[in-house]
From Swiss-Prot:
GO BP annotation list: mitochondrial electron transport, ubiquinol to cytochrome c
PANTHER family named among the record's database cross-references: CYTOCHROME B
Organism: Sphyrna tiburo vespertina (Pacific bonnethead shark)
Protein name: Cytochrome b
Taxonomic lineage of the native organism: Eukaryota, Metazoa, Chordata, Craniata, Vertebrata
GO cellular component: mitochondrial inner membrane; respiratory chain complex III
Keyword Transport: yes
Cofactors: heme b
Name of the gene encoding the protein in the UniProt record: mt-cyb
Length: 381
């Protein structure tokens, strides 16, 4: 009887088609685990964030103290806060690995799914940015000041736009209050878009490592991949709890233990590690507007990837030339992340500029050209 309810009940039927009887390619590897891991990350972040919001006060005179209160006086508040802060880092690790898998195996050819994914990345970055401002430490305040100030680069409307976002003439109480509102609201928008992301994915079915049609060889999602995902859940929770319990401040900035002071500028203003690659690209261009446009394009360039696909094969698995350039792109992104955390001086300036040019060249010119060359080599045989 339970089987029939699962397949006939209007609500359970949707869940059944998405999680139980979903036809999945039999050869999808460990790299396909990250979608479900991102779902788990989102649930963890929403739940821990909800408990933090119960004790947090969005006021410049009390924000820092309320975070201290959470860590000292609230039952397991220190744990909730550490899981939330490090959960964000793990979220971005999973996102970047998920995107890398999509680029390597050609999953971007599901254009609707891919483009919604890019919008999700942008929303995730916005959520993380406004969330980083909430503890109201030195790096929170100055990070908010520097990054929001970039909008002043836009001609004519720039200054008005910045003051509109600030809610005044500087980052102050109005800014903190609205950033808290955005930080509370955006995860639910991410949740809604995730459902649409899955909806489009289930219209086409999952890609597979070979990048070929797998309709002839599908197996049900449960029990095969549900248990495989469960293993991933346990591994990720192990890493998250290890990080939160033993090294909670490893990925944070020491400056944020100092309450925000508008009169004292930190020696080196930098965002969290997951934004450093984009921050390095921003800093590598001497022009302010050019830097802002490059920063935005460093993320939205992912939307051009399906249009720049010139290969006759979908996956990179049998394309050694493109594989080399893919791993060069990965190495280049790691170099950009490192450069973003360094002071603005030689040789870091030059390395950052070379890495930024390489980043865009690999996406726009080198990888499409490598694919075209591979097509020519294949046609010779």
């Amino acid at each position: 009887m339970a089987i029939f309810i699962r397949k006939t009940h209007p609500l359970l039927k949707i869940m059944n088609h998405a999680l139980v009887d979903l036809p999945a390619p039999s050869n999808i590897s460990l790299w396909w685990n990250f979608g479900s891991l991102l779902g788990l990350c989102l649930i963890i972040q929403i739940l821990t964030g909800l408990f933090l919001a119960m004790h947090y006060t969005a006021d410049v005179s009390m924000a820092f103290s309320s975070v201290v209160h959470i860590c000292r006086d609230v039952n397991y508040g220190w744990l909730i806060r550490n899981i939330h802060a490090n959960g964000a880092s793990l979220f971005f690790i999973c996102v970047y690995l998920h995107i890398a898998r999509g680029l390597y195996y050609g999953s971007y050819l599901y254009k609707e799914t891919w483009n919604i994914g890019v919008i999700l990345l942008f929303l995730l970055m916005a959520t993380a940015f406004v969330g980083y401002v909430l503890p109201w430490g030195q790096m929170s305040f100055w990070g908010a000041t520097v990054i929001t100030n970039l909008l002043s680069a836009f001609p004519y409307i720039g200054n008005t736009l910045v003051q509109w976002i600030w809610g005044g003439f500087s980052v102050d109480n109005a800014t903190l209050t609205r950033f808290f509102a955005f930080h509370f609201l955006l995860p639910f928008l991410i949740l809604a878009l995730t459902i649409i992301h899955l909806l489009f994915l289930h219209e086409t079915g999952s890609n597979n490592p070979l990048g070929i049609n797998s309709d002839a060889d599908k197996i049900s999602f449960h029990p095969y991949f549900s248990y495989k995902d469960l293993l991933g859940f346990f591994v990720m929770i192990f890493f998250l709890t290890t990080l939160a319990l033993f090294m909670p401040n490893l990925l944070g900035d020491a400056e944020n233990f100092i309450p925000a002071n508008p009169l004292v500028t930190p020696p080196h203003i930098k965002p969290e590690w997951y934004f450093l690659f984009a921050y390095a690209i921003l800093r590598s261009i001497p022009n302010k507007l050019g830097g802002v446009l490059a920063l935005l394009f460093s993320i939205f360039i992912l939307m051009l990837v399906p249009l720049l696909h010139t290969s006759k094969q979908r996956s990179n698995i049998f394309r050694p030339l493109t594989q080399i350039f893919f791993w060069l792109l990965v190495a280049n992104s790691i170099i950009l992340t490192w450069i973003g955390g360094q002071p603005v001086e030689q040789p870091f300036i030059t390395v950052g500029q070379v890495a930024s040019i390489s980043y865009f060249s690999l996406f726009l010119i080198i990888m499409p050209f490598a694919s075209w060359c591979e097509n020519k080599i294949l046609s010779l045989n």
